[in-house]
Amino acid sequence: MRVFTQLAVRLLDAILPEPDEPEHLKTGRRGEELAYFFLRKHGYTIVARNFRTPWHKSELDIIGWNGGILCFIEVKTRTTRDIATAEAAVDDTKRNDLRRVARHYLRQCAENTPTRFDIVTVYLDRPKPEITILKSAFLLSGE
């Protein structure tokens, strides 16, 4: 399975990046691909990626089920650990943006669907990427 994941990521790296794409966008895209496979390996059923609405600038990187909980997952990728942690980039403003988009997504779900927001951090500063999940990083209600 590990070999398949590595091959899939290499294939996606070859297909997805555009030559003129800024380096930080390439890094983010690679992190999201790694997070996608990592989450699947850890039991998540992915139902959407890069979900946007016409009314909000933010997007939900990954949406998936973990058990009976619908998870809205923000992926943060870093190539260095010199500054703040990756999860620190999900500040109050970003959280509120993600909540707005999640509420829009929830309009198509059953009422009272259990939800949570997870943050996946991806560090690419070592030969093997380091990926972690922070489950229930914040709530839909804004608490």
Curated annotation (Swiss-Prot):
Pfam families in the cross-refs: UPF0102 (PF02021)
Any GO molecular function: nucleic acid binding
Lineage: superkingdom: Bacteria
InterPro entries named among the record's database cross-references: Restrct_endonuc-II-like, tRNA_endonuc-like_dom_sf, UPF0102_YraN-like
SUPFAM superfamilies associated with the record: Restriction endonuclease-like
Coiled coil: none
Family: Belongs to the UPF0102 family.
HAMAP family on file: UPF0102
PANTHER family (UniProt xref): UPF0102 PROTEIN YRAN (PTHR34039:SF1)
Protein's UniProt name: UPF0102 protein Acid345_3985
Native organism: Koribacter versatilis (strain Ellin345)
